[in-house]
Amino acid sequence: MGMVFYGAGYFGKIAWEHYTKKKYADRLIGFMDGKKTGQYCGVPIVSWNDIDVTKTAVVITVQNPYVVSQIYRELQNYKVQHIFWFINLNWTETSNSFLSSECIEGSNWGACPMPQAEIHV
């Protein structure tokens, strides 16, 4: 399955660095970003017309939970079937898949994932 990183910013670059450094088997098609065009990290920035939403995993490479919620709703509107969130942790180093090693699956988060706040006193 091919994948796209949604977010050509700081965490998108970190995701790309993890992906290239560890030589994962997943195929990176490109980045998506609502504000950028051209290339990012030498990878093309693609549009919805460039991907098959039924066969392409979209990895949200943003850390702000409010922005993640907005992106998630956009992905649902486009009927993306394979949604992941890059969490910047390699918690299963035995896998050769970027999606299972570096991300959490979000395809079943529901209609409206809400960000949560934690307060530590």
Stretches with model-predicted labels:
Residues Y19-Y24, L75-N77:
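Short, solvent-exposed amphipathic alpha-helical segments in soluble enzyme
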Residues K36-W109:
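Phosphate-bearing ligand-interacting subdomains
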Residues M3, D26-I29, H82-I83:
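Hydrophobic anchor at the start of a short beta-strand
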Residues M1-Y19, V121:
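Glycine-rich adenosine-cofactor-binding loop
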Residues K22-Y40:
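NAD(P)-binding Rossmann-fold cofactor-contacting core
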Residues M1, Y24-A25, D50-K55:
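Flexible, charged surface loops at secondary-structure boundaries
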Residues F5-Y6, M32, T61:
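Short hydrophobic segments within beta-strands
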Residues S107-H120:
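A short alpha-helical cap/connector motif
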